Amino acid sequence: MPSENLRWETLEALKNSPKGKLKYSPDWVEKGEDVLAGCVEVPSLSPLSGQILKRMSPRMLLKNCSRSSSVRDTSPGLSEEAAVCRSAPISPRLKRSSCSLPAVSIQTEEEEEKEEEEKAEVVVEAPAVSPEASVSTPPAVSVLSPRATQISGCIRMCEQKHKAKAKMELSLRQEQQERLVATVANHESEQLKRFEEFMELKQRQEHQSIRDTNEKEAQESLGRQEKLREEHRHRMKILNLRLREMEQQRLREVELERQRQVEGRERHRAINAIQEEVLQLNRLLQPQQSTHAEVEHAPYITRGNQLCSQLSEVVPAAADDQFPSVEDLSVAERALQEMRSLVRSLQEAVSQAAERKKKKEQEEEEEKRRQEQLKAQQEEQKKSAALSAKEKAKKEGLQTGADDSTLKWYNSLQDLANQCAQAFDDLNKAKDTQTKKLKMELQKAATTPVSQIANSSGAPLKEAFEKIDKLLSRRPVTSAGKTVSTSQHPQGLEFASYRLAEKFVKQGEEEVASNHSAAFPIGAVASGIWELHPKIGDLILAHLHKKCPYAVPHYPPMESGTSVEDYQKILGYRVDEGKVEGQDSFLKRMSGMIRLYAAIIQMRWPYSSKQGLHLHGMNHGWRWMAQILNMEPLADITATILFDFLEVCGNALMKQYRVQFWKLILIINEEYFPRYLCFASILHFTCIHWLQNIE
């Protein structure tokens, strides 16, 4: 089929032509560009155009030219293209490039294929043209057939279809992109939701973890608390057990203490009974008128006195609010057994002497018996005469109280103390805090050095003395880390003086009563302060006389209208809520104050620079001894204070008064003791024996 071949050759030639190589752009119409703007080459005939013209008939060529002339005015561009297409030969190169043209819609539609076939047939059936004719024709003939116009229209329709298709594809692409964007957005939103859900899950997990941790910690805390409660309950059980054991131990100790006190009281009563029996047996050792002269009683008496002294050392220790121990009781029992054996041996010696005497003087027994009777009568007469003389002396010489001058001196000292107390009454009753604080500091500064004396000596004793002297001299004193002076208040000196004197007497009442050796350092400091500040000495005497009237000496009588409790207070007893202190405690306190008074009388401050006599020296001690012996003795107290005074101050009195002192001792032994023995209790024979040993 030659027409079919020509069609394909034509198409190949069109494809290979410059216009067939135009690049399609859908923006030509919108931008107003020319379709052939890309082809600027001058149209020229192909070398093969001659062969084509030869094969075409002249009739067809003229027909085509007429068609082209009719259509030239309407579409000159297309006629030129058609002419070029007809005149251009079809080469294999154009066949190969035809596949690249964008004419897909022409090949797909049947009408376009038919038009192409008809065009190809026209080109093939054209008669051959001679070279001369081809040369004579104009070189650029523009032939535009209706078919070309149709093709051009088809091309434009194809372009429009392509544009519509492109628009449709673009809209589809946009829809696809929108769907893709929506899908991506949905996916991202889902991802965001999943992420938020993941974050919420993670947050819930964290919260759950925190909650679990808190619950675990709470459980652990509850466990620890329960453990602590259990430990607390366990400790409480242990403490309760310990408290129960301590309470049982305390009850056992109380029971043991009660038993100890019961046993101690029993031992105390036993020792008292033993002492009473020993003293009675000691009386049996004394030589009697009926005893034979050949028997020497001196060794027995000496040993009996030693046993009494040994026993008396046990009794005072038991009297100081303590109970005698089993060893003390055993010592007392051994002393009693020895005293009994001593009495038995004495009785045996007396009986043996009597037997010897009977053997030697059997012949003179009756005569000696008469002589003994006569001698006994004479002794009785002497005793009655001595008793009558003593009764007469009692009626004429001894006093029951202090004389008027002594009472006047006693009252003046009490008035001085009362005036001093009234002088600092405002300071004593002050209510403001500053004044109260000053009062307490002054009291500490006055009493603390006295409390520190005790058994001290040397530098500590001198330091205490200097502190007291500075305080009374209105100089500043450091006490408990604070500086205080009596000049800080107008009544400070009177207050400090009164409290200082009161503290000295209290030390004698308590410290000296328990520790007899403390009387000498305290007495030395008090004597030195007395020399520098005489008013302190008067206040010390006033406080001493008030607490111990026997230091005057004075036995206050019971006046009418005075109750028993008040009278006991006047005598020096302590009365607390109607309960009077025991006799042993009373004698112990009186002994301490008398010892302090005796120490003050004989002691001098060793560092004193003053010369001269003591303001209250040994002459007052001699006066006290004389006055106490001129007064009727009182049971217990007289022997106690007389012994304490002589034990502390006796040596000093002996050195100063010598013979007169020994005369005084003889009077005590020969006249005072017999009077005292008439009413003294057996328990206080110890003091009498001590006084006898002084002789």
From Swiss-Prot:
Subcellular localization, as worded in the UniProt entry: Nucleus; Cytoplasm; Nucleus, Nuclear pore complex
Molecular functions (GO terms): inositol hexakisphosphate binding; phospholipid binding; translation initiation factor binding
This protein's GO CC annotations: cytoplasm; extracellular region; nuclear pore cytoplasmic filaments
Transport among keywords: yes
Coiled coil: 105-126, 216-255, 326-433
Segments of this protein annotated with the region Disordered: 203-226, 354-400
Keywords, ordered alphabetically: Coiled coil, Cytoplasm, mRNA transport, Nuclear pore complex, Nucleus, Protein transport, Translocation, Transport
Cysteines paired by S-S bonds: none
Family, similarity comment: Belongs to the GLE1 family.
Subunit structure, interactors included: May associate with the NPC.
Task performed by this protein: Required for the export of mRNAs containing poly(A) tails from the nucleus into the cytoplasm. May be involved in the terminal step of the mRNA transport through the nuclear pore complex (NPC).
Name this protein carries in UniProt: mRNA export factor GLE1
Source organism of this protein record: Danio rerio
UniProt gene name: gle1
